[in-house]
């Protein structure tokens, strides 16, 4: 059951990432069609921007994310010895280098991992998690975060964040060009027949709906990786109850104050406790706690 879940979530992640990349290139093509009379130029611009953003994000993601979430680094075991030794132990079991350890001063219990790869990774927990979780529960949480590092989820999350930023930038460029009178000549489109009109309408819709689709893809990726990290974390501790109890405590707590909204998908549980009505699950950064607990209990 465990290995089935891991394999299934890895496949879903591949599909979501392919869709994400195709969306970036499609929006680039729409931008090229609408404002440059050449879809290939738009695709090339989108690809170059995506590559630049990904390199920038990957090279400095840890420091950027930690600053955004007001986290401060623990240099040794003197401040939080239990936390330090649990991270050390779980990293050893997971066969990864010891990640950097950070604390976020927030009363709400939560945690996240970030970085580029296992050699350049970091784990952050809130002061609230240290106050409310026992050792067994904290081990479950840290094992979950170590699994994110081991499975390269941290890199995937960084890439998804960069691609979402590129989509937002491309759409902003298109909006500004449209506002200042750029774009295709309507007479040319009418002379080109129905095909050109359809392409024009589709391109405009893609520019409008692109950021929405990017957000849905980013959240879908996050949800899949949470299931995978839950399963992989239990593989490290051999104790699903520790993570189950931790998730239940975290889900019943108050929203965080220190978390940055753009980093919400990184946390083990939604730091803002967002839960909406019809269709809102598409924009949830995490699967429902009830479903995660059920899967853990079925292992």
From Swiss-Prot:
The keyword Isomerase does not apply. Belongs to the peptidase M48B family. Its EC number is 3.4.24.-. One of its GO terms (molecular function) is metalloendopeptidase activity. The gene is htpX. This is Protease HtpX homolog. It is an enzyme of class 3 (hydrolase). GO terms for cellular component: plasma membrane. Keywords: Cell membrane, Hydrolase, Membrane, Metal-binding, Metalloprotease, Protease, Transmembrane, Transmembrane helix, Zinc. It comes from Latilactobacillus sakei subsp. sakei (strain 23K). It is a multi-pass membrane protein. It is found in: Cell membrane. InterPro entries: HtpX_protease, Pept_M48_protease_HtpX, Peptidase_M48. It comes from the Bacteria.
């Amino acid at each position: 059951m465990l290995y089935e879940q891991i394999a299934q979530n890895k496949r879903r992640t591949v599909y979501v990432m392919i869709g994400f990349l195709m969306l970036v290139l499609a929006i680039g093509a729409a931008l090229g069609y609408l404002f440059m009379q050449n879809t290939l130029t738009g695709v090339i611009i989108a690809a170059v921007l995506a590559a630049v953003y990904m390199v920038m994000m990957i090279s400095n993601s840890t420091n950027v994310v930690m600053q955004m979430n007001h986290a401060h680094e623990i240099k040794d075991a003197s401040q939080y010895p239990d936390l330090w030794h649990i991270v050390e132990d779980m990293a050893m079991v997971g066969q990864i280098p010891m990640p950097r350890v950070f604390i976020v001063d927030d009363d709400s219990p939560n945690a996240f991992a970030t970085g580029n790869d296992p050699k350049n990774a970091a784990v952050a927990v809130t002061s609230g998690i240290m106050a409310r979780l026992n050792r067994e529960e904290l081990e479950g949480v840290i094992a979950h975060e170590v699994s994110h590092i081991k499975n390269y989820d941290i890199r995937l999350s960084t890439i998804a964040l960069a691609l979402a930023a590129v989509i937002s930038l491309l759409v902003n460029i298109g909006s500004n060009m449209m506002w200042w009178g750029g774009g295709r000549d309507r007479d040319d489109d009418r002379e080109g027949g129905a095909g050109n009109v359809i392409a024009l309408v589709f391109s405009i819709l893609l520019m409008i709906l692109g950021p929405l689709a990017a957000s849905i893809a980013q959240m879908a990726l996050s949800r899949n990786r949470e299931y995978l990290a839950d399963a992989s974390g239990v593989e490290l501790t051999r104790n699903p109850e520790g993570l189950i109890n931790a998730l239940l405590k975290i889900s019943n707590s108050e929203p965080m104050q220190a978390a940055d909204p753009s980093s919400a998908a990184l946390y083990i549980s939604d730091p803002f406790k967002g839960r909406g009505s019809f269709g809102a699950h598409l924009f949830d950064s995490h699967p429902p706690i009830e479903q995660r607990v059920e899967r853990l209990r079925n292992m």
